[in-house]
Amino acid sequence: MKANQFGRKGWTPERIENLSRKTFVITGTTSGTGFEAAKILLSKGAKVTMLNRNPKKSENTIHTLKQVLGNDILVSAITMDLSSQASVKKAAELVIANESKIDALICNAAIAQVPKQTFTEDGWESQMGTNHYGNFTLQALLYPLIEKSNGRIVTVGSMGYNLGIKTIQFDDINWDKNYTANGMYSQSKLAQIMSVYELQNRLQAAGKTNVKAYACHPGASKTSLIKTSGSLMTRFIWQIMKLSPLVQSAEKGAYPQLMCATEPKLDQTGFYGPTKNLNTVGPVGAHKLEPHAKDRAVAKRLWDLSEKETGITWNL
């Protein structure tokens, strides 16, 4: 096994330097890893804009963060439903109006284990529409602000990418014929991860080496992801698992995305997360990504389909 480049303890937030005058945009911060990531960034002096679906929860989150860190922190929230292209576009417009640059966009929000096939208002299966198409559009629209600061795009994936079929099911993209909660979640996360490495290829081809794109995952962390969208049985099983040593804290689950957003000279070709117990817990660093997640032909086809479906073209 390859040694962790950050040593025996792996990467930790102690490596983050002062982030004053740095601006971060992060999705899904009202609980779990997103909340912990926002808290740590703010504690280092960063300015943080949170994109969340529920405005009341955003308000409560800001109140909590100020109680912990003080009233002088630079934190704000914009309402955004990642499953709605109209909402994503409106939120992006507000970010562009309020910010002159973005040092890192952290795409943390997701839904998982939706028990029955449901569709977004745009006509896509809900997990694919939220986790993939929603993030694809958000990243494309905010790319100009990220480019201004030679910034980063961080996609929070999942080891679930490797638990389903090993390609994109283009002939039935909404999984009308064989829908399962696990299979569709895996598909959406595979699509997210493939798009990161395809973006890297396109940035390189365009000579835009100043912008970096990273893929990471939180491992098995104590979050509310399954609680908000999984079936009753899935939620019950997860509550039991959270009591075991196979699951780590939400704070530790936030380390991979924080590393990808802040660590200088981090190799963007890596895949980052916990490195023990099948990459579910343990020291954070780079670990193996299965070859099918970097299948260039499939990734290119997915990218072209995503531009067609969303009507969004990246301005590279």
For each feature predicted by the language model, list its residue ranges.
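Rossmann-fold NAD(P)H-dependent dehydrogenase/reductase core
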Residues: 1-233, 308-316
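Pocket-edge positions in alpha/beta enzyme catalytic cores
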Residues: 50, 80, 245, 291-294
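C-terminal helical subdomain
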Residues: 88, 188, 240-287, 294-300, ...
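A C-terminal cap/extension of S-adenosyl-L-methionine-dependent methyltransferases
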Residues: 235-239
